[in-house]
Amino acid sequence: MVDVCKKRENYLTWDEYFMAIAKLSAMRSKDPSTQVGACIVDKNNRILSIGYNGAPNGYNDDIFPWDREGNELETKYPYVVHAERNAILNYRGSRKDFEGAKIYVDLFPCNECAKEIIQAGISEVIYLSDKYANTNSVIASKRLFDACNVSYHELKDIKNKEVILTLKK
């Protein structure tokens, strides 16, 4: 029997909720090797925007190269729009709303996305994985964030939590 006088105990924390939305957004990515999602949240825990990595609007992703290796123009790298950038670009409100906002992402942002995050006015980055920590791109990202007072931290407590979503009537 459920005690209706007490709140439910196994609900998602705000961090878990927003990271789950970022992960759900990543499922829209058509990239066969890397799916990344992003969720931007204001200081009142309201979702401002979401994004995922993929081809630019209007670019046919059936002809889009998804390879990771080979001639650079035949790989995904010069064409793909990262999740963080898509989330920033997808927002249709005032950029002023990003002041003091947080961005939740699967993967620590690259240096190009770090610049976008800083320019947007986002003040905190929460990520799940930093698997490219030793790359120049991520080292540069951390230098940029440190110099511009953007805090960042790994969301550790969520690592072993499973959120199951079933779409059925």
Regions found by a protein language model. Name each.
Residues 1-169:
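Zinc-dependent deaminase catalytic domain
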